[in-house]
Amino acid sequence: MAKIVDIKGREVLDSRGNPTVEADVLLDNGIIGSACAPSGASTGSREALELRDGDKSRYLGKGVLKAVANINGPIRDLLLGKDPIDQKALDQAMIKLDGTENKATLGANAILAVSLAAAKAAAQDQDLPLYAHIANLNGTPGVYSMPVPMMNIINGGEHADNNVDIQEFMVQPVGAKSFSEGLRMGTEIFHHLKAVLKARGLNTAVGDEGGFAPNLASNEDALKVISEAVANAGYTLGTDVTLALDCAASEFYEDGKYNLSGEGQVFTAEGFAEYLKGLTQRYPIISIEDGLDESDWAGWKILTDKIGEKVQLVGDDLFVTNTKILKEGIDKKIANSILIKFNQIGTLTETLEAIQMAKAAGYTAVISHRSGETEDSTIADLAVGTSAGQIKTGSLCRSDRVSKYNQLLRIEEQLNGKAKYNGRGEFRG
């Protein structure tokens, strides 16, 4: 049995040029596992705490030297001599050492980087791909599927500097026969979208997640230009390709109302739920994330009752990968899907528990990146190893996004038909 002999933390940069945490876990046989913690822009209020230094003389206060010191000090001391394969024991030990509900003492960014680095070291120690080790930890050894990518090709909201209120407009290649074919379809649509925008004289600069970020007449206008790009790429909207939204509604929820400032419209929860229902009737939108504010559970119930039978309603800020909050949502029949982000909860073990709880209740689980990413591609292995079926990892440019897609291509090739791509079968309706 290999043992942990050293743990090292360091400050590195994420895709927005902000510091984040990287950790190395070294074993006594020379194996090293390394992982980086991502960082979000539109964040749920109940997420685990990302520890920042607050020292305005460094990185505008966004340094993470405190989190790094926690890795190199108390976390290292705690885990030396431990077995990296016992992921649950490692994670529970760090949770206990932290002693807070939201990991505010050590920082979720510190704990997560070590948690994932340990998993990578353990996989190498067993001569397993990371996805196979994750499947073992998940209690589903040898069971894999390739995820349907939800490709964010128009960015708005907090992910872009434009007038579009809805944060993400995504395409899903549900008609593909494999992940690699789906990736090709999405990439072709992305390039055709650029041409559509250029023809309109619109900006083709990209946002945080690699999608285009033009100023448009309305949120629906984004759906129109995407529809045109899909057709120009030679695909049929609704059969080959479907659409998805991430409203990130908490970002435009003010005084109990939903304020679409880009359109000059203000809605009640009932009104905004009806607005979204109208979009699903006019376009093949089969998934909507954070359609209402994280605290507006009454509004979420209205939305779920209106369209939840046919549309995947994903809780991101709503559930923050937290099993306690997810259980409450399941009990109250709020939403029907959870977005899974490692750093919202802070350990691999708790992430797997959230996926398992969702699946047991008939909810889907969508594996997701954050807007602040690195070259770390762990979420690709997580999606395959848990057979989650869906992944959100941005658009078809920026290496911080493409690194995940490329890892999925490698995994699909390695599994050589043993991991099915289920396409439309992963969704409701």
From Swiss-Prot:
UniProt-recorded Gene Ontology molecular function terms: magnesium ion binding; phosphopyruvate hydratase activity
EC number(s) reported in the record: 4.2.1.11
Cited Pfam families: Enolase_C, Enolase_N
CC annotations in GO: cell surface; extracellular region; phosphopyruvate hydratase complex
Domain of life: Bacteria
Subunit and partners: Component of the RNA degradosome, a multiprotein complex involved in RNA processing and mRNA degradation.
Encoding gene (name): eno
Catalysed reaction, written as an equation: (2R)-2-phosphoglycerate = phosphoenolpyruvate + H2O
Organism from which the protein derives: Pseudomonas fluorescens (strain ATCC BAA-477 / NRRL B-23932 / Pf-5)
Subcellular location per the Swiss-Prot or TrEMBL entry: Cytoplasm; Secreted; Cell surface
Protein's UniProt keywords contain Cell division: no
Keyword Flavoprotein found: no
Keyword terms: Cytoplasm, Glycolysis, Lyase, Magnesium, Metal-binding, Secreted
Entry's cofactor comment: Binds a second Mg(2+) ion via substrate during catalysis.
Function: Catalyzes the reversible conversion of 2-phosphoglycerate (2-PG) into phosphoenolpyruvate (PEP). It is essential for the degradation of carbohydrates via glycolysis.
GO biological process, one term: glycolytic process
Enzyme class: lyase
Positions of (2R)-2-phosphoglycerate binding: Q167, K341, R370, S371, K392
Active site: E209, K341
Pathway info: Carbohydrate degradation; glycolysis; pyruvate from D-glyceraldehyde 3-phosphate: step 4/5
Protein name in UniProt: Enolase
